[in-house]
């Protein structure tokens, strides 16, 4: 039976054992210590960040198109609406008149919420999953406040008995 390698030094912990055919370093041990939810959380975070990096380039292409369409909209703005315009054309012209930072905020909030949810799945305690999501966070804070008010009301009803 071969003796397992000693990873007490940092330089040894980053090397692969020769001849065993599998990784048995500290990263492998940390991965084995995680439960299934944590592993899937880290995989989800990695895939989410990879998809975000791919979408980042696409967003800047949309930004250039958005700026071009917005400038065309400003330059060709008729004073009164034409008779042949449809509701989709009207909606498109109204949405193009909104600034780009507004659209960025609209898409950034759900993006960050999803990232924080995936990141919370990597935590060891399953009770803390989802606390970073705004509606759940607000519900927890309100519930704590109501519990505090209820407890303080119960304490104020108690009569003080002097002995």
Curated annotation (Swiss-Prot):
Keyword Membrane part of the UniProt annotation: yes
Keywords linked to the UniProt accession: Golgi apparatus, Membrane, Transmembrane, Transmembrane helix
GO terms for biological process, alphabetical: lysosome organization; regulation of vesicle-mediated transport
Membrane-spanning parts: 40-60, 98-118
Domain of life: Eukaryota
Localization annotation: Golgi apparatus membrane
Topological type in the membrane: Multi-pass membrane protein
Gene Ontology annotations for the cellular component aspect, listed alphabetically: Golgi apparatus; Golgi membrane
Pfam family, any one: TMEM251
Described purpose of this protein according to its UniProt entry: Required for mannose-6-phosphate-dependent trafficking of lysosomal enzymes. LYSET bridges GlcNAc-1-phosphate transferase (GNPTAB), to the membrane-bound transcription factor site-1 protease (MBTPS1), thus allowing proteolytic activation of the GNPTAB. GNPTAB is involved in the regulation of M6P-dependent Golgi-to-lysosome trafficking of lysosomal enzymes. LYSET is thus an essential factor for maturation and delivery of lysosomal hydrolases.
Family: Belongs to the LYSET family.
Quaternary organization: Interacts with GNPTAB; this interaction is important for proper localization of GNPTAB in Golgi stacks. Interacts with MBTPS1.
Protein name per Swiss-Prot or TrEMBL: Lysosomal enzyme trafficking factor
Species name: Sus scrofa
């Amino acid at each position: 039976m071969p003796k397992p390698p000693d990873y007490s030094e940092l330089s040894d912990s980053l090397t692969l054992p020769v001849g065993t055919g599998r990784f048995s370093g500290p990263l492998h041990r940390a991965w084995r210590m995680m439960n299934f939810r944590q592993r899937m959380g880290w995989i989800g975070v990695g895939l989410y960040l990879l998809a975000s990096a791919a979408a980042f380039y696409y967003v800047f292409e949309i930004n250039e198109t958005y700026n071009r369409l917005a400038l065309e909209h400003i330059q060709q703005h008729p004073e009164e609406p034409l008779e042949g315009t449809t509701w989709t054309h009207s909606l498109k012209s109204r949405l193009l008149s909104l600034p780009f930072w507004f659209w960025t905020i609209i898409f950034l909030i759900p993006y960050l919420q999803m990232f924080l949810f995936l990141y919370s799945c990597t935590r060891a305690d399953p009770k803390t999953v989802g606390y970073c999501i705004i509606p759940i966070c607000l519900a927890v804070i309100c519930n704590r406040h109501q519990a505090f008010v209820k407890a303080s009301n119960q304490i104020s009803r108690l009569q003080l008995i002097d002995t």
